[in-house]
């Protein structure tokens, strides 16, 4: 005499079968990943970066992803650029046959690199360029395919240092970057800049890194730290102040910057030179609308000595 199967028993059997199936897939993927993929990922990380990458450990997850712990990235001068507690490298398994047959480079198998809680250090060099400009190696002409995967950033912190000594702190930074080492890289990031919200998206030509387009929305920015990026009259020097509700597009072409957008400002101070006379200005406030070299200031007030 048989007994009817209850829904609960069917669910338990289904879960067991599913678990065995997943375990079977994981069992088949892991030996391949251990033998071929882990060394390939290790090689590509070193080949892609001008500098050094070190990590405490590397292991293969159940799904074949490569997981690295306590990763550090240093530039060619051995300066720390990033420290990442956990880096997860996901694969495009459909690219494996092409790579094994020699039709694609090893970089083609990397789909997504996820950085968990990275701490990033970016600084401006004396010539106005940035330490990260030369960090990535372009692929050689013999490569069948360059790296064009996604980089996902979760809960990053960091610092941006300008050549004049100003430092801005980043925190709670999340984003996604579609990286193409030999072409146009696009991305979007949002988080906190000096404890105020900021969102940035745009693109940069990796073959000519002076060519970029950035769109910025910021709640509040200390003006003293960004003046060396803003086109301004040579007779005007701004040394203090806060920008609010910033909406700006910043474009770089051949090392020259142009900006358009609008913002509000207050507490602005500095100097203005008119001929042989220099004026002290302070407590400036108002709104600005700007387009390249055209600037419109409204609802504005200043103290002038």
Feature locations, PLM:
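N-terminal type II signal-anchor transmembrane helix
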Residues: 2-48
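Short extracytoplasmic
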Residues: 47-70
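Secondary-structure transition motifs
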Residues: 51, 70-176, 207, 229-236, ...
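Residues on the solvent-exposed faces and adjacent turns
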Residues: 57, 70, 91-93, 117, ...
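Short beta-strand segments that buttress and anchor functional surface loops
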Residues: 70-74, 187-194, 298-303
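Transmembrane beta-strands of outer-membrane beta-barrel pores
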Residues: 117, 157, 193-195, 206, ...
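Beta-propeller and related beta-repeat scaffolds in trafficking/envelope systems
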Residues: 160-182, 190, 209, 234-243, ...
């Amino acid at each position: 005499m048989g007994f009817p199967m209850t829904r609960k028993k069917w669910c338990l059997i289904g879960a067991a079968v599913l678990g065995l199936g997943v375990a079977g897939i994981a069992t088949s993927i892991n030996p391949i990943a251990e033998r071929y993929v882990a060394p390939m990922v290790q090689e590509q990380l070193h080949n892609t970066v001008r500098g050094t990458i070190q990590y405490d450990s590397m292991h293969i997850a159940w799904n074949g992803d490569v997981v690295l712990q306590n990763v550090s990235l240093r530039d060619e001068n051995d300066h720390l650029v990033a420290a990442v507690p956990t880096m997860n490298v996901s694969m495009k398994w459909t690219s494996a046959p092409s790579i094994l047959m020699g039709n694609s480079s090893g970089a083609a198998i990397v789909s997504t690199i996820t950085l968990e809680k990275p701490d990033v250090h970016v600084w401006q060099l004396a010539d106005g360029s940035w330490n990260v400009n030369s960090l990535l190696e372009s692929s050689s002409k013999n490569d069948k395919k360059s790296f064009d995967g996604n980089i996902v950033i979760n809960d990053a912190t960091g610092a941006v240092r300008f050549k004049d000594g100003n430092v801005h702190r980043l925190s709670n930074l999340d984003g996604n970057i579609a990286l193409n080492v030999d072409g146009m890289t696009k991305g979007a990031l949002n988080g906190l800049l000096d404890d105020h919200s900021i969102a940035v998206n745009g693109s940069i030509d990796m073959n000519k890194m002076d060519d970029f387009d950035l769109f910025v929305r910021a709640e509040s920015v200390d003006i003293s730290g960004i003046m060396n990026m803003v086109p301004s009259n040579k007779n005007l020097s701004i040394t203090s102040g806060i920008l609010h509700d910033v909406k700006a597009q910043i474009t770089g072409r051949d090392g020259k910057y142009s900006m358009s957008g609008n913002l509000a400002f207050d507490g602005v101070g500095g100097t203005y030179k008119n001929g042989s006379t220099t004026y002290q200005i302070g407590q400036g406030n108002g709104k600005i609308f700007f387009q390249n070299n055209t600037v419109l200031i409204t609802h504005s007030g200043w103290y002038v000595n």
